[in-house]
Amino acid sequence: MIYLLLGGICACFGTANALGASTLLRPLLDAVAPLDPSAIAMLSTAAALCAALVSAFFALSRPLAIHQDELLFLAIGALGDLVAARFIAMLSPGSAKLLGNALLFTVLALPKVYFSALAHSIRPLSITRMASLPTSVLLGLVASFLSFGAIPLTLMAYDYLFNAQQEESSTAALAVSLCAMAGKLIVMLIRLRLNLPSADILLWLLPGMLLGTAAGIIPGVQRSIGRTGETALGLSLFTTLINMAAALA
């Protein structure tokens, strides 16, 4: 039952950002279930697909005002789970464990990240690290409207504007991704409220597809990054590919 509950919660995130729920469900299952990675991967995919099917049945019976484009995002999110399971399986065990711990740490300790670990001045702008919180929210909302992963945008912003260290930028990028998920949910509610046509959705998807790809490549070309940065960059590029599929569908 806990897997189905977690799958339902993660399916909501998958609907909001057109990304499969495995990236969020996997560290949660790893924390509560003493199972091997292959079993956790299978449970993650099964729970997310079950939650997607249940959500689809609810949408077809129309108790909620969900349009066809939202059902498309839900289906892409479910398929993204299958791809995400293979994507994480391609990583080394250390990288996968590092990614899972970073995601779980971000979900459970977001205030601590900003108010203690990042509480020092920023150069060359000489702004206190407290200013990174509204900056992260703004970056997350911009990334939501552009419909691409917030990780590459945050890596560039913290690198070029704040002169932050790579580990610091990667941690902030994972935190901003949560802001992007919330922002995408807000965008979805705005679209439902204003009854925006599909053309407006593509208007936000296509620029995000191009900018997300460019932003994800620049940090890797600019400097050599550590294992954490490589994992975050790979996750952001995977998000961009999923959004490209959503734009072309």
Residues covered by each model-derived region:
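Hydrophobic transmembrane alpha-helical segments of multi-pass transport and channel proteins
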Residues: 53, 178-182, 210, 214
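A general structural signal for well-ordered alpha-helical packing
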Residues: 154-158, 166, 175, 179
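Transmembrane alpha-helices of multi-pass small-molecule transport proteins
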Residues: 43-58
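Membrane-interface alpha-helices at helix entry/exit sites of multi-pass transporters
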Residues: 35-44, 67-72, 163-175
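Short hydrophobic/aromatic, small-residue-rich stretches within specific transmembrane helices
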Residues: 44-48, 173-177, 201-206
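Hydrophobic alpha-helical transmembrane segments of multi-pass integral membrane proteins
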Residues: 169-187
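Juxtamembrane transmembrane-helix boundary motif
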Residues: 1-20, 24-38, 57-146, 153-160, ...
